[in-house]
Amino acid sequence: MTISGKDLAARLKARMAEQVATFPAKYGRVPHLVVILVGDDPGSQTYVKNKAKACDVVGIRNTTVRMPGDTPEQELLDKIAELNADDTVDGILVQLPLPKQISEPKVIEAISQSKDVDGFHPLNTAALWQKRPNSSCVVPCTPMGIIRLLEDANYEIAGKNAVVIGRSQIVGLPISKLLLDRNATVTICHSRTKNLPEIARQADILVVAIGRAKFVTGDMVKDGAAVIDVGMDIDENGKLCGDVDFASVEPKASVITPVPGGVGPMTICCLMENTIQCFLDKVAAR
């Protein structure tokens, strides 16, 4: 079964729009997300436009701050500090990747934890891994989108063997933790993993986030596996594809996400959820 992130995202955004529509009467305003775009990378510009469109659908106020590609690191940090201090701003997102003169870790850490809608701040990462009772932490958007997709497909995670190919702070590590929290047994693979195809074939749930076009083929997947493709690559014909060879894997999978239209729309959807969460956490703290 191919599960559409586009369809699920549309349903969830409609539900969020109903929620946000009640905010002016309750709180006097709607959430406000600020996205900072440094440079003119075409891919980043597309991502930022898609985020703005999603905000418009949900009813979230959104502002895009555009800075030239040669912006000094300190200038970007000063802008973040300004937005951190602005009480009308609920969420701050700096579009990655950044130009080489700017340290991504330094920028991520500069964003206030309470406005970190990406969930990348070290304190949010720590809260996710510590799983503190009653703690409110923002979960990275792509991993949360994957969980939403599996849950919407009524796929039982508990007791399953999950293999995650990729160990990034953005996807691989946090999705491993979310799967663990739902009682899966998780194996994390990476570029140095030996016998990777053999390990992948043991997976009931296979999450692929390695950044290599059509890396996972049908002979690496066992019958009935749930396959989640996080990749966004270009194939030999110049067409958009994922890290999974959909044509050979789809006949074997019980559940599979396409590229495009799978995980991508859910990433943006969960960004909207995180922005609303940051807004409501601020309101509750007053």
List each language-model region with its residue ranges.
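Positively charged, low-complexity intrinsically disordered leader regions
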Residues: M1-Y27
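Glycine-rich, N-terminal phosphate-binding loop of Rossmann-like dinucleotide-binding domains
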Residues: L96, I210, V230-G231
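Rossmann-fold NAD(P)-binding glycine/threonine-rich loop
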Residues: P105-S112, D116, T125, G231-A285
